[in-house]
């Protein structure tokens, strides 16, 4: 099954709910790619020996990896951490996440500042470009196991919105204007 993504409603209800508009407005992988979001569907049951994952890591220079179990039983200050993840922010580097178990949502802003909700389920690997406004939350299952990938030493420094003058944000916006200027292989 392919990645599911949609435009979100404006409700302030529980962030762990799907927040579909009525009627639903689904978002294609092509539209996500226009925003710089890349996607691969992999086999989470065999991630340690997955040649496709190894190739992605090699091609993109992802030389550091760790695993993160997010659930109330395994994370101290769980609610506080979720609140931090759900605060809209950017990063200087790509954010690369591979869902191995459970599920959750990455929300990204499109070029018209609308929220798009991306439902991460087992096997989904996404790359969010540096400079894109985004946030993360678990869904109602309250559990996700993610592989985090990095180029070099892991750095996860959020820069909360507004960041319009941040050089990475400016570069991202410039890239949107020029459609990123290169062909990127993902599916």
Curated annotation (Swiss-Prot):
Cofactor names:
Fe(2+); Ni(2+)
Q: Where does Ni(2+) bind?
A: 89, 91, 95, 134
- CDD domains named in the record: cupin_ARD
Q: In which pathway does it act?
A: Amino-acid biosynthesis; L-methionine biosynthesis via salvage pathway; L-methionine from S-methyl-5-thio-alpha-D-ribose 1-phosphate: step 5/6
Q: Record's Gene Ontology CC terms?
A: cytosol; nucleus
Chief place where the protein resides: cytoplasm
Recorded catalytic activity of this chain's protein? 1,2-dihydroxy-5-(methylsulfanyl)pent-1-en-3-one + O2 = 4-methylsulfanyl-2-oxobutanoate + formate + 2 H(+); 1,2-dihydroxy-5-(methylsulfanyl)pent-1-en-3-one + O2 = 3-(methylsulfanyl)propanoate + CO + formate + 2 H(+)
* HAMAP family the record matches: Salvage_MtnD_euk (MF_03154)
> What this chain does, per the record?
Catalyzes 2 different reactions between oxygen and the acireductone 1,2-dihydroxy-3-keto-5-methylthiopentene (DHK-MTPene) depending upon the metal bound in the active site. Fe-containing acireductone dioxygenase (Fe-ARD) produces formate and 2-keto-4-methylthiobutyrate (KMTB), the alpha-ketoacid precursor of methionine in the methionine recycle pathway. Ni-containing acireductone dioxygenase (Ni-ARD) produces methylthiopropionate, carbon monoxide and formate, and does not lie on the methionine recycle pathway.
Name the UniProt record assigns to this protein: Acireductone dioxygenase 4
């Amino acid at each position: 099954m392919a990645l599911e993504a949609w435009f979100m409603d404006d409700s302030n209800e529980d962030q762990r709910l799907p927040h579909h508009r009525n009627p639903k407005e689904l978002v294609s992988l092509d539209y996500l790619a226009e925003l710089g979001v890349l996607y691969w569907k992999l086999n989470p049951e065999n991630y340690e020996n997955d040649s496709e994952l190894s190739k992605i890591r090699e091609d993109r220079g992802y030389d550091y990896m760790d695993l993160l179990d997010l659930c109330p039983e395994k994370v101290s200050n769980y609610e506080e951490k979720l609140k931090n993840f759900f605060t809209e922010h950017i990063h200087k580097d790509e954010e690369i996440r591979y869902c191995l178990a459970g599920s959750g949502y990455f929300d990204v802003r499109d070029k018209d500042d609308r929220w798009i909700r991306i439902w991460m389920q087992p096997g989904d690997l996404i790359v969010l470009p540096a400079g894109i406004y985004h946030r993360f939350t678990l869904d109602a299952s309250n559990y996700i196991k993610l592989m985090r990938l990095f180029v070099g030493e892991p750095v996860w420094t959020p820069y909360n919105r507004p960041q319009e003058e941040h050089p990475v944000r400016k570069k991202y916006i410039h890239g949107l204007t020029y459609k990123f200027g290169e062909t990127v292989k993902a599916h």
